[in-house]
Amino acid sequence: MIADSIHQKGYLIADILTSIRGLIALYLGYICWQGRSVLDAFLILIFGAWLSDCLDGYFARKSYRLGHLAEFDGWVDWAIYIITLAYGTILGHYSWTFFAFFLTLNILAFWLSKSIYVNQAFHFLYILLGFRTVWLESIFWRRFFVLWVAGVIFFKRKRLLVQIREFISGWNYLLNRKISKLD
């Protein structure tokens, strides 16, 4: 009964979750400028965005259909990653020069390659930089996110392997394209 409903309407749930994540991104962009005073709220919203990203993918895959907002899913994720890096920069863990360089490198690499895999490779790097910020800021959140990641790795091993392959493919594509243009 429930599986049938998810199969028929799962893409609508995925669209709702993508919309919620978009609103979370807007709010994160608004509050990130307040610095450490909003650390807990910021990380709770990041966790909510991460959870909604996992769930919208689940519902879309179970319905075997992309929702109307599926094309915006990666862009919403990218906005959240940029905001997270900006927040780490505001907290003093990265310089604004590094932030600008990294963002420019991401945009140029994606623009030159026209490959979603290249952008996903950068997404992975944004996640690592975000984890570094959490690691340096809060013992509680460090433990929370380590447990969360361990759970994701345990329960979503196959999906994680796919994402690792996409990460490696993205960098291979970008680097091989650059090397072939130099020849």
List each language-model region with its residue ranges.
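Multi-pass membrane catalytic core of lipid/isoprenoid biosynthesis enzymes
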Residues: A14-T18, K62-S113
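Membrane-embedded alpha-helical segments that form the functional core of polytopic membrane enzymes
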Residues: I16-H68, A100, T104-L105
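Core segments of transmembrane alpha-helices
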Residues: T18-Y27, G74-L85, A100-L105, Q120-T133, ...
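Helix-coil boundary and interhelical linker segments in multi-pass alpha-helical membrane proteins
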Residues: L23-I44, I82-F98, R132-F145
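Juxtamembrane/interface motifs at transmembrane-helix termini
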Residues: F47, A79-I80, I164-R165
